[in-house]
Amino acid sequence: MPAKTPELEMMDEDRLIEEVLDKFVNCHEQTYEEFLRTFTHLSKDNVTKREAFGTNSSENNFTSIKFTQRNEPNDCRLSNKAIFLHTSSQCSEEEQIMIGDGQKAGSSFQGDLNRAGKVKVDNFLDIEDLDLDEEINPQLSKDVLLLPGQVEQEVSLSVPSYIPSVAIQPVTPGTKPRPTVKAADKQSKEIVGDEVQPFSLDEEFDYDAVVLTPKFTPAEMNAIKELSKQKTKSADLEDPHD
């Protein structure tokens, strides 16, 4: 058989490449409908049929298990576990049992599988379990009934946040005594209600004769005066004299 030359091999490769390119260029253009057909669309009926088929196949798999050596303890435990799984898979389809007071449900560890996997569990709270008078009513009376920005009026006597401090000056002959403010008598009375009350001045109080609390102490005032005197002296020395 004659051996192929390198030129023939190159020609064969070129032909193969041309054939592949021709198939690719001349192939049928896929439409959008054909593109959608490549996907699998599941309906509700298909899902329910698959679930039913899955449960039947799982039941058949559990029933097809055969144990040849039943006398050994390990095999007995395995059979109990298989039966427990079989009953738990059917508990969603069968009726669930409501356990009353004094009754118990079986477990796979004790070997009693009569009610295993069929017990109905109550995960909801009944209205009877809640004490409406103690829990709900105080919350409604304290939180819900209050208006926005309103405060509970539990304290009858309210202390004002600011009480003006008035210095008592000794009375000298020839000067008019200045009125003093008593904290207990002049406390503002709290007006209960949401209505806006008009503002009015106290006619008995002399607002012009109020003695204000000094900002600086006498020692600080003396120090400030000394500093001002020194500044004036230094300013006079720096200025040229005519």
From Swiss-Prot:
GO molecular function: intraciliary transport particle A binding
An annotated GO cellular component: cytosol
Transmembrane portions of the chain: none
InterPro entries per UniProt: IFTAP
Keywords, alphabetical: Phosphoprotein
Listed GO biological process terms: acrosome reaction; spermatogenesis
Residue positions, PTM Phosphoserine: 57
Key word Cytoplasm present: no
UniProt keyword Phosphoprotein, yes or no: yes
Function: Seems to play a role in ciliary BBSome localization, maybe through interaction with IFT-A complex.
Oligomer status and interactors: Interacts with IFT122; the interaction associates IFTAP with IFT-A complex.
Name listed for the protein in its UniProt record: Intraflagellar transport-associated protein
Source organism: Bos taurus (Bovine)
Lineage of source species: Eukaryota, Metazoa, Chordata, Craniata, Vertebrata
